[in-house]
Structure formats: C-alpha cells, structure tokens
Amino acid sequence: MIIFWKGENDLSENFDRIRISLASPEQIRSWSSGEVKKPETINYRTLRPEKEGLFCEKIFGPVKDWECHCGKYKRVRHKGIVCDRCGVEVTTSKVRRERMGHIELAAPVCHIWYLKGIPSRMGLLLDMSPKVLEKVIYFVSYIVLDPGDTPLLKKQLLNEREYRENRDRYGEAFKAGIGAEAVKSLLYEVELDKMSSDLKEEIATTTGQRKSRAIKRLEVVESFRLSGNDPMWMILDVLPVIPPDLRPMVQLDGGRFATSDLNDLYRRVINRNNRLKRLLDLGAPDIIVRNEKRMLQEAVDALVDNGRRGRPVTGPGNRPLKSLSDMLKGKQGRFRQNLLGKRVDYSGRSVIVVGPNLKMHQCGLPKEMALELFKPFVMKKLVDKAIASNIKSAKKMVERGREEVWDILDDVIKEHPVLLNRAPTLHRLGIQAFEPVLVEGRALQLHPLVCTAYNADFDGDQMAVHVPLSAEAQTEARLLMLASNNILNPKDGKPVVTPTQDMVIGLYYLTFISAEAFSKENPRAFSSTDEARMAFELGQIDLHEKIRVKMSVPQKTGREILKSHEAQTFLEEIVDTSVGRIIFNDAIPTSLGFYNEIIDKKKLGNIVYECYRLEGNARTADMLDSLKSLGYEFSTRAGITVGVTDFETPLAKYDILQEADQEVEAIERDYEVGLITDEERHAQVVEIWNQATDDVTEVLKNSLSEDNPVYMMATSGARGNFQQIRQLAGMRGLMADPSGKIIDLPIKANFREGLTVLEYFISTHGARKGLADTALRTADSGYLTRRLVDVSQDVIVREDDCESVEGIWVGRIMEGSQLIEPLHQRIIGRVSVDTVIHPDTGEILVEENQMIDDDIGYEIERAGIEKVKIRSVLTCKTRHGVCKKCYGRNLATGYNVEIGEAVGILAAQSIGEPGTQLTMRTFHTGGVAGDDITRGLPRVEELFEVRKPKGQAVVVEVNGKVRFGENKGRREVEVLGENGEVLGTYPVHYGSRLKFEEGTEVEIGDALTEGPLNPHDILKTKGLQEVQRYLLQEVQKVYRSQGVDISDKHIEIMIRQMLKKVKIEDPGDTSLLPGAFVDISSFEDENNREIRAGGLPATCSPMLLGITKASLNTDSFLSAASFQETTKVLTEAAIKGKIDHLIGLKENVIIGKLIPAGTGYSAYRETSISEAPESENMVSD
C-alpha cells in the first residue's frame, strides 16, 4: 500500500515522499469497487464480460467509453449515471486501469513473502523456525495454542495421531489449531512492546548465537512496533484483485484468446475459494475441508509468488505462470521495463552514413523521417499560414506530401535541435543534440568528428533520433547537449573531439617535410605567405618543399599564453617552413602560436585543448571544422594507400633469428644435462625470443623510409601501430596457449612471407580467445556500469561549501624510478585545503580554499613541492551529495561544477565506459610460482565489490619482530613482543613469497607475503583513510595499465558511497539497533539528539560495503527494489513502513517526477521569472 503526502493544494503531483506498508483487510476492502465472486472472464458468444467475474463491468467500469453493459445509456451526456438495469457507471473505459476488486476468502491464508522470505519475518516474530511454521500452515501438523492445565507446551507441534490421542485423553482442556488460522491467533497474542523490552534485556545479558538471534528478532519487532503495522495483516482474509486492464485478455486473429497469466492464477483462487465455501456450507468432513484450505493457500501462494515454494504452477507447454512478484522482478519487470525507461513518441531510427560536409552542430535528417517526426508542427504551421483550413485537411496535405509541405518543413526544423543516440549509451556523450539539415535518401548523416564520442563507425551502425518538444527541452538540448558544446570528455577533461584516421593522415601529409628536404641549404625565398601560396598554386613549388618566408610570427605558444594570461605578440621574421605548414596554420587561431612541425594525432589533441582553454567553445568548433575539411582534402590529394610492396622484410632479420636459435639450443642443452629446471628453461627461452622480436622490430623501423605510407600511418597515429607492422613485415613472435601460458616456440614468419601450418595453428588460440573475451567483456562491463550507476545515482552537487577542514594528501605517482603521473595532473581542478607557499621565494602560490588551475598547478610542481593537501569528496560533509569545493572542476566543461550537477552518474559512466577496453580473465605469468594474477575487468570488479582477492597477502595485526617456524608440517610466521613473547601467529603457504627477513620489525597492517591485500584487513588494521587510498590506487593501476586516463574524483565518489554506512556496536540510549547498518549522518544525528537529552550515545565501527550491497542498503526502497532482489527489498520496506524521501534520481524517474538534478534541482525550480516593468525613462528619443 502506498500513501502520498499531499501539499497544500490537493494535487497528487505535489507529494514529496512516499510510504509503503502492510495493508489491513479494511483497507483492501476500501480500495475495492466490488467483490469478484465468479471465475468467469468473458462470455464466449457475446465477448462481453461476465457479471461478477474477473472482468465484470459493474465492478471495474465500462469496456466502451460512456456506455453501460446493457446499452440503456450511450453518449457522454449520461456521465456519472449508474444504470439501474445492469449497475454499470457511465464513465470512460480508462477507469478499468485503476479500479480494483477483491475476493473474500473463506479461510485465512498466509502471505508467502513473510513466511518464506529470508529471514522469515513470521518465524522471527513468533520465535519459530520457518520449517515448523510451514508444517502448520500447509496442514501437516497441529500447533498447541493454549495448553490449559495439560502437560502440553505452548506452540508444541502435534501430528495427526498425537493430536487425536491428546484429544481423547484431555478432551477440550487444551486448544490446538492448524493452518493459517492457528498462526493468526498466535500473531494476535503477540505483545510488541513487551517483546521489545524482553529482547533488549536478552541482548544485554547473553552472547554468541543467542544474542545474534535476539538482535534479528528485535529488528523485526521494532519494525512492526514503530511502523504501526499489525502482525496479523501478514495473514490475508481478503485478497485484492488488480484492475482488469493491467491483466488484459485480447482476441487473436484465429478467434482464440491470449490472456495474462494472472487471470489463470486468480481463476484458480476463486474456484478453490468457492468450492471451500460450498464444503463449509454442506458441513463436509474435516479432512476434506482441510485439504481444500491447503489448496486455497497454495493457489494464493502461486498468485503472489509462483515457484517460491514447491513446484511452480505451469501453463501450456510447461511454462511457469508469471505471478504478481514476477511482474515486478528482473529486466522484464515493471520497474526496469516500464518505469525506469519507456519507449517514446517522436522518435525514429535509421542507418548512419558519414556527412563530411556538415558543420560540427549539424546532422543530416532524411526528408521522409523529418516530415513524420515534425508532423504536428508542420500541421499547425499550415493552419496558421491559412494554407490548410483545419487540422484535418492539414493532415491530409502532409500525408500526400504536397509541394507547400516541404517549404513549411524547412521552416519548422530551423533551429529546432534533435537528439541522436547510439546504443549502447555508455556515457553521456552517447546522446547529443544537432540541428537537422534535410537530406535526400533514407540514412542519417553524422559528422565524422563525433564518431569517437559515440564509438560509431559506418559499417551498418544504426542511430535513434528524438525530438525535444517543449521550449525548455529545446533550450536545454541547445545549451547543454549540442555536439559543439561537448568537446571535452567528462572522464579526464581531455578533448574527445579530435581529428582521426583520414583527417590525421591528411594533416600529417600537409605538414610533412622529409629530413633530406629540410637539410637543403638555400631554399627559395618569398616576401609573404600569399606570394608562397600563389607560387604553389601555379605549380612553381611543391607542398613539402622547404621555403623561406618573411611573415609576422606569433611569439608565444598557446601554453605560454595560458600561464601568463597575456595577449599574443607578433614579430616580422624570416622563417624556414613549407607551404603545407602555412596552409595548416591558417586554420588555427593565431593565439596558439605558429606550428612549424609535423603534426600528428597527439599534437592535434593538444591544439584542440589549448584552443578550447584560450578561445572557448564556438571558436574551437570552427577550428575543428576547418581542420576536418583540410584533412580530408589533403588525404584525398595524397592518395596514400597500402600495397604489399610497402612491406619489405629487412635482411638482418634472418641473422637475428639465427643468433637467437643458437642461444636457445645452448639453454636446451643445459636443461637436458640438468643444470636448470624446466621453469627456468621456459623463462629464459621466452626472454630470448622477446629480445629477438624487439630487435627485428627495431631493424624494420629503421628500414622503412619516412614517406613510406605504412610508416606515415603508424607514426601519425592515423591507424595501426608498430606492433601490427612488425607482424606484417617483421615476425609475429611468441603466442599464448588457451590457458594464457606463453608457448616457447615463436612464429618466425610474418604475414607477408606467410605462416606454416604449425605456426598458423599456434596463432589460432589467441585469435579465438580474443573473440570469446570480447563477447564476455561487453556483458560484464555493462553489468559493472549498472551497479556503479545504482550505487552513486543520488550523489548530486547540493551546496557551495560544506566547510570541511579535512582533505587528502596527494603527490606524484612513481613506480620504481619511472614517473607514472606527475603532481600537476592530480591537483589541477581541485581546491587546496591550506595555503601553499613557494619554498624558496616565500611567495603564496595558492590561498586556502582556492581552486588550483592549470598555471598554479604547473607553478607548484616547478617549485619542487612534493605533496599538496586538497579538498576531496572522500572528506566532504554534505548530506546526500557533495559540495562544489570538495568536487572542484567539472571536467566536461573545464569550469567550476554547478549546483545540481549529477556527479554520481557522471562518475559511474566515466568508470564503466572504458570497462570494455579492459582485458578479461587472469594471466599466467609463467614465472617461478606461476601465480594467477587477477587483472583487468575482474580486478576492478573485485575491488568495487570488496571481495577477498585471489592469493591475498597475510596481514599483521600487531607490532613486533618476525620469527619463522613450523607447526604440524605447516609454515608459520610468529610476531614477537619486546620480551620475546608471541603476540600473533600467522600460517603461511609454502608457495608464497615472504617480504621480510627473520628478525625484521613489522607494524600493524604490514603484509607478510606478496600478493593483493584484502581491503577489509586494511580497514581493520590501518583505518579509513588508508583503505580509501588503497582502493583508489588499485583501481587506477588497472585502468592505467590499459592506457585509460580517469580522474581520481570519479573513483573517490564510488569509494565514498562504499564507506557511507557504519555498523552499530553499542546503541547506548539511542533508538538504534545493535548490528544495524546506518548512514554516518543518521548516526551522528541520533547521537547529537541523545547527548542533548543527557543520554548515553551509541558507538559504531566503519563498514566497507561492496557496490551491490551498498545499492541494496540505500535509504530509498524504490531505488533498491528496482535494482535487484525486488521481493526481498519490498518485504522489508513494507514491514518497516519505510518512507522514501525521493532524494535520488531513480526514485523520481520511477514515480514520473522531474529528476532533482540540473534544471530539475529544487534550487532552480523554486525561482520565479517575471517581466521587468517598463520604466518611462528607458525609452530615449
């Protein structure tokens, strides 16, 4: 049952929270419009609903609008009249979607959710095991309700024989019952207040198993006590019947009927109920009545949750029928199928083709599709312009495709953006807005530069089009979603729109000058760039020829301007360059400086980023369009192709192979003599062949000329890399077998020479594994994204500053002597906690609570500062979200984050989207111990779900000295105190590698052996901040190994959500329950309230929950129920009478309200806009 709290005006839209609880029999009757007495559905001759049946018009309302069953009243003028002949109210047929009925049950039945759920709520309340309860409810055993003065015990079970014997012996001196009625009378006797105080006492005085059971029981008792639910309501006397239009029956072509499974299940219940009534009226023997009651119980079970107990009821073809619970569960259930995502009008889909002539903000929309999508707009315009007299004739004109219609359509789509979406939508750039341009044909045209964001190509991909209708929707699409406004990638703040493939090769070719040409002594000279271009157009000079030009040269690079904030300066100089480079520099703003170098993909990315930071969105979009046109033009002119003759195998390859073969032979001889083990032999052979492969690649690289098309493709970053060229013209190298172990027999041939049969066979393992992995990875990555979104969907920027004084220390990341991530990358776009001062000059580099922008970031790094304390979401004090200061810069815009930004979803998408690129499965390193190292996607999942890692390290829980020993054939490590006493003993496998020598000092939380750490151990031994640091570092490690950049703040948001709950250890005088998981903020509130009242506060310990568990433990039951384990979540919520305050996004999507993010955020909704009064003095002469 759901209650809405309404605001002052009585609109159901105006509620701000929603409550779910158990329904009492009176409530069920009050919802109902009448009792369903017959199992009939519709009459097979008249095809009208049967009276008092499951589709009865008297109960549920008329089948046809404004028409009663007998036909006495037809037409809308009789609205509201109840027909005196058939009793049907004259109203719209829509009421058949909302009017409910009910069935009066002849015997009480138990609701299976509360009996069979885990834990069994009924069992905990009555202190009986679910098995025992089941025996009573399904008429196997009697239960003693009141022993009277007999030696029987209350709640003792008696089988049929024992019951008869005791009846014969004691007569009516004791009371016993069977079935749901007996359980109902036991529930009637439950005194919640008394039970609550008894259990609290028991918890205080007992330990171990009894205490934990008492805690579980107390939780259920408190749920009932505080929610006002009566435990007797878990037993049903009345069964609600859902509206008929939600369980429809439709006629198929062949005259047969298709019906919802629910009708079959309801029919079984009604049949059995009516039969039971008849048997009771006839006074049938007890055994027959009991059997009928049991069957009624089973029929209601099947209706509520088919298959929860025993074999499910099946329909035709042995298919289990879908019960009410199944209607809610899973991907096809009500939550995920209809509430969280719906199919929408004003949408279409088609194949995409490239639109190389489009501007960045445009897309090509096929004429037919546009006409259909914008039909209502076109019709209105036709009537407005008096081309058509009314809407009906306008519709005819549109359908016939008359001349005038196309002109109007052109008019209508001007400046009306449409949204393009490509599935799978892995991040927010999977839906962007474009202005439509009408095109012939039936394919959508897509701008080539947005392909990266959509991950689209033109090999048959399809995309969907959606039309934003309202003025607000169009404005949002234009301002926030227009493709030219989405140049940066939200996951790392780098440009996602950079020229690719043909464009890159074109620009590389354009700016290319060979080393030979560049060393030419006295090139031709020109007095201006225009003169040089003229000479080029007249064929006097070549595109790549070195020339000398007098020109006005920008003196600063884009980066220098960004740092100094000064304007660009120019000087007349004579420059050695080429016509190609002059043409290239004409396409980019002068503020970026003059690029006199060969341009590859990486440099293009930098140019786009600098242009965005210096010149803003619009100018960057223009520049990208010019670069696109230039790139395509010159890649066409270059005509760069790949032919088999472009791959020449270097002769030195054969010498390298011969040398390697000799080395391997020597190792094999050592192995045969027994000097080395097989593992050592394998490792050395692999090492030799890897070196040989690298040597061949090096020789190959040097043998390719600079203007070799393949070399140009690889070096420019247009397509391919040297690994692929190595396989085509060098050697394929070593391959792995299906288990991932490297085969020590290399493939010496390349594809140009062709492989032998054995070589081909060896290489098929990898190819097959690659395909299988890709398929598995996609599904796993999608599921990970779904869990991440669910755990973080309610994290929204809610305030300007939470005034937290805490933060986290960050420094550069090194691995050995190699720099992995410099300091500036980690601090740019974050807010500093303290004032940072230059160690040498004493100058203030950044004030406290000031944003660290690009130049301050570089400045701090140059000053030699190693660590900076920054504000972080991990230490943010804002409730249900984060504050602007702790979050910092919004990476998608490069500016400060706005209030109302849904940063949780942004973070989930940023982590989930690259998931498909991560490798799968474990790798066998084939080292000495042959460890299985979990890497890639499974490792990320393991970290976010905080599972116990495979081959985890043993962690010390005390300080002391290490001593090795053995005990019963097991290796042990003992930690000794100062006086030599043993403080802790840790069993260690013989296979694991130890990190410490005997006698070394160890501290709490140190790992004794190699291997990944268990995050729970870190939390226990080293505390909260250390586990946050570890999780962040480990997740980043996996992504970095695949070359994926993700900003720390996204991962921090997830870690914060995982650490949001605490476990109550001792409740003190608060109303909290021991062992309960509570939000940190709720815990603090309760304690503050208790301290103010002079009571004893509660104590807690921090909890680290995996993302699935954290999602299910969210305060919102709607969000949790729509995620997983729907029935379990709803059972719990109903008993507790939970209130959902509709704080997150999912809850609001489910009930159909605006989401509280972006312009739907309350702070923005409550602003009112009024026209400024026109004052007279504003009008001037």
From Swiss-Prot:
Enumerate the cofactors the protein uses: Mg(2+); Zn(2+)
Cellular-component GO terms for this entry: DNA-directed RNA polymerase complex
Q: Where does Zn(2+) 2 bind?
A: 802, 876, 883, 886
Q: Which GO terms describe its molecular function?
A: DNA binding; DNA-directed RNA polymerase activity; magnesium ion binding; zinc ion binding
- Report residues binding Zn(2+) 1: 68, 70, 83, 86
> What Gene3D superfamilies would the database entry show?
1.10.132.30, 1.10.150.390, 1.10.1790.20, 1.10.40.90, 2.40.40.20, 2.40.50.100, RNA polymerase II, clamp domain, RNA polymerase Rpb1, domain 3
Pfam hit, one = RNA_pol_Rpb1_3
Cofactor binding: number and manner? Binds 1 Mg(2+) ion per subunit. Binds 2 Zn(2+) ions per subunit.
Which reaction is catalysed here?
RNA(n) + a ribonucleoside 5'-triphosphate = RNA(n+1) + diphosphate
Assigned keywords, A-Z:
DNA-directed RNA polymerase, Magnesium, Metal-binding, Nucleotidyltransferase, Transcription, Transferase, Zinc
Residues that bind Mg(2+), according to the entry?
457, 459, 461
Q: Which GO terms describe its biological process?
A: DNA-templated transcription
**Record-listed E.C. numbers:** 2.7.7.6
InterPro entries assigned to the protein according to its UniProt record, in alphabetical order = DNA-dir_RpoC_beta_prime, DNA-dir_RpoC_beta_prime_bact, RNA_pol_asu, RNA_pol_N, RNA_pol_Rpb1_1, RNA_pol_Rpb1_3, RNA_pol_Rpb1_3_sf, RNA_pol_Rpb1_4
Q: How does it assemble?
A: The RNAP catalytic core consists of 2 alpha, 1 beta, 1 beta' and 1 omega subunit. When a sigma factor is associated with the core the holoenzyme is formed, which can initiate transcription.
Describe the task this protein carries out. DNA-dependent RNA polymerase catalyzes the transcription of DNA into RNA using the four ribonucleoside triphosphates as substrates.
> Family assignment?
Belongs to the RNA polymerase beta' chain family.
Q: What is this protein called?
A: DNA-directed RNA polymerase subunit beta'
Q: Which gene encodes it?
A: rpoC
